[in-house]
Amino acid sequence: MVAHKLIGYTTASDELVADSAISLADFLSGPLGMAGGIAWMEDYAFIQGTGAGQPLGVINAGATISVARVGTDPTYPDLCNMVENFLPSGRGVWFISQSLYSEMLQMSGPTGNASYLWGNAQSGAPNMLLGFPVVFTEKCPLRNNPGDVILADWRYYLIGDRQATTVESTQFDLWRYDKTSWRAVHRVDGQPWLSQPLYYQDGTTQISPFVILGSKSS
């Protein structure tokens, strides 16, 4: 693994720094500032990263199995096929595009069941789908694109954090312009432990801890 560097940079006039009702330094180091933005990009790369100058996301990994979808929107048979290709001993979690939220809640099975996705009656319990917890996220591709539905066991994903996010400021970078500058730096890499899917004992049937819903079958 080779840690990839992500850098953020911004400036503000010294008047803004002095007159701001909040501490800009604290804001930029918080979840809504540069540190939060880098954390968002890191999660995005673990899902959709190409591996070129950034982590290799599960969607583009060689170990991932892509299951052809039956139609355009995800269907119940699609999800069953994904579970069938998932590592039996895996501790899977569904990652589903936020753009599919309404579609998933209204999904019906072949017997006309109203919904296969609902929250547990216990307070704080996550939504469950076919026995696996569900996370809706905007970090997945938009609906009807490969990877809009992912079933993953992140124990099989290797993350190498070489440098935690640091946010530093200086008044000397743009001193003659009466400005303060901030720089955020983070170094990380990530990729699945596996380079290809696993096989059952028959040596033919593939399974994987990473399964995505792919393109429509032709």
Q: PLM features: residue spans?
A:
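Structured, hydrophobic secondary-structure cores that serve as assembly/anchoring elements
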Residues: 1-218
